[in-house]
Every structure is written in C-alpha cells, then in structure tokens.
Amino acid sequence: MSKSYKTPGVYVEEIPKLPQSVADVPTAIPGFVGYTEFASSNSDQEVSDLLKEPIKIGSLLEYERCFGKAPKLALSPKGDFDHKYVLYDSIRLFYDNGGGVCYIVSIGNYSQTSFAPEAFMDGLKKLEDIDEVTLLVLPDAATCLEASDLASV
C-alpha cells in the first residue's frame, strides 16, 4: 500500500538492501589500573576477590561499593601532603565529566609501601582479553613509580 502524501511532487524512497556496515557499539571505554582502598564484591573488605580482576562499572557509587574511597590525606605543618594514590580521583573526574562504563583493575591497596612496574603490567595483561576497552589509564603509575620505571610500563 502506498503512503498518502500531502503535497504533489516526486518522492523517492530508498530501500536498504545491505545490513548496516558499522556496528553500533560504544567507543572510548577506558580501562583503569591502579591501587584501591580494597577490592571486594561484598561488604567484607577483608576478602580481596576482585584483586587483579577487570570489573565493569557504570557509576562512582559502584566503584565505591567494590573498591572503596580515596585515601585519607595527611597534611604536615608545612602544608605538604603525600598523595600517591590518585585512581579514585581519576574515576571521580571521569564520572563528573559524563563518563559511562569503564573497567577497573585493582593491583593492590593503600597499604603498599613498595611499587613495581610489574604490578601495572599484570593489570594491563588482564585488560588485554576485553575487546571493549579502547583507552588505558594508569594514573597511579605517574605518582607511585620512579621516572626510570615508567618507560617499562
């Protein structure tokens, strides 16, 4: 049955014969690797079942439930502070700027005293199998590793 047009003239209707060539999939999905307060899928923070496992999250609230919050800052009388762990702030800013889903790989907690590039490499290897991840973000690498170790990551 033909369509009823309101004005006279020539109308062209294109009928697609091929399926859509570009898939509708989200792009720019980041994979964050760094240190978290804890890594647990339930309220028992002693169990680290999410440690070194890529977890897909969709909000800051989900992140806080699985990985905790930012570390407490310790200010000195001079006004200096030592803030090595910036993953939480990076995630917070990601969602403050309209971020959607992302993947998190926790490679340890805030009690770490020594940092090795291998921990970050292990986290990156966990993200290799996830096709959705198109951006790699390692904010803690810049603050925890020595400059000479950054090149190896």
List the model feature ranges, each with a label.
Residues 1-153:
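Surface-exposed assembly/interface segments
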